[in-house]
Amino acid sequence: MTMTDPVADMLTRLRNANSAYHDTVSMPYSKLKARVADILKAEGYIAGWKEEDAEVGKKLTIDLKFGPNRERSIAGVRRISKPGLRVYAKSTNLPHVLGGLGIAILSTSSGLLTDKQAGKKGVGGEVLAYVW
């Protein structure tokens, strides 16, 4: 069975594992998911990720990050642009999540970028998700 929205599946797995205080979460690998994981790592929301060989295909394993008293580093995740309703933002009208405390992940002509990176480069694109 094919998955219609792999990014939403990734974000849901992250949200569920985070709320259950799991240390790692695994999912099927794709280049897009790996780029999203790169952004989450660079912004400090996850501890790291690795690509592993599975019986069929590859899998992406993400190490979740918690504070010293097991506080969650990811407070919330929301998928914005969906297969049935794409959401785009111009470079002059980029979204700001929680007044700049969170990030918006955009798919641009320059690759996947956060809202701040897209603003510096002056590019817009499809708004994939909000993370805070």
From Swiss-Prot:
Function field: One of the primary rRNA binding proteins, it binds directly to 16S rRNA central domain where it helps coordinate assembly of the platform of the 30S subunit.
Species of origin: Paenarthrobacter aurescens (strain TC1)
Pfam families in UniProt: Ribosomal_S8 (PF00410)
A biological process term (GO) from this entry: translation
Annotated GO MF terms: rRNA binding; structural constituent of ribosome
Assembly mode: Part of the 30S ribosomal subunit. Contacts proteins S5 and S12.
InterPro entries: Ribosomal_uS8, Ribosomal_uS8_sf
Membership in a protein family: Belongs to the universal ribosomal protein uS8 family.
Gene Ontology CC terms: ribonucleoprotein complex; ribosome
Protein name: Small ribosomal subunit protein uS8
Lineage: Bacteria, Bacillati, Actinomycetota, Actinomycetes, Micrococcales
Keywords assigned by UniProt, alphabetized: Ribonucleoprotein, Ribosomal protein, RNA-binding, rRNA-binding
SUPFAM superfamilies (alphabetical): Ribosomal protein S8
Organism domain of life: Bacteria
